[in-house]
Amino acid sequence: MLAPKQRNQNAFHLAGVIPVAGQPLDFNFDWSDCLMPLAPNYTAVERSVIECAYAGCETIWIVCNDDVSPLIRHRIGELVYDPIWYGRVFDPRPSESRKTIPIYYVPIHPKDREKRDCLGWSVLHGAVTAFKIGAKISKWLTPNKYYVSFPYGVYEPELLRDYRKDISSTKPFYLSYKDKTIADGEYLGFTFDGKDFVRYRRVIRKEGTGMWDGSELVDNKFATKKLPVEKRYSARFFSLDKIFRSAILEDAVVSELPWYHNIDSWENYCNFIGSKNRDRIFRPTEFLLKYREFNPIGEDNEAN
């Protein structure tokens, strides 16, 4: 599953996954929690998009449901430019060599909503969607690896520029802060492949509950007793460390961040806003992060 056939490493495809759909935080605003501002005109999900761009992702998949995707799409658009290729100084025609990174918006499948739609499941759902869609088009579009950026972890996305080669390699890559990674439940970027996907998904399938009590079966097949309401579909409340605790850090590239803030609660968000590190987060140049759309087939967009 999610393991493309062997092909030339020059065709390595890194897909970025930004999980948004999940259990709500305690901000209680009318808009999605991922749209909390980090700086003037700069939101948490936009920082994640820039992080994926600096990491070298060829595509970006934002996992969000239809009730919030229009506003997120209004902020971000359908593409972002690769910051490494955008303003190359020694390129005689830099505008012609710019690389666009398409952005796709993926809703959680209706059968999974209110059943196992935690933030960790959004990561896995984004990866499997990227794989299935790419495989239907061409084997060259199936991702080799997936890079995950969480809107609720704040650090400088530009730091990923120095690790692009490590991220787009066969070795796993993890960001860490004070020796803690995604395996400890922190919102830190990391990569995974098809084998990791199966291992993470197994946690949700085996440890998550359904509607029926599997401890009492008739003919060892049929459940006849329902679980109490509060115990049904427990996977929707699974934390990141529960799902990704099996992350294999041995032989992986682990990069220690100079600073990092968790903003998954109002208290943590206030700590970031009151810290000196907030001045290190600012909206990139308009040419890099701006609402853009792909031209429809057969139509000219004169505005661009």
State what each model feature region is.
Residues 41, 64-68:
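Residues in the short beta-alpha loop(s) of Rossmann-like NAD(P)-binding domains
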Residues 1-36, 42, 47, 53-59, ...:
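N-terminal nucleotide-binding beta1-loop-alpha1 segment
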Residues 248, 254-304:
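C-terminal catalytic/acceptor-binding lobe
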Residues 70-143:
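Short phosphate-binding loop-to-helix
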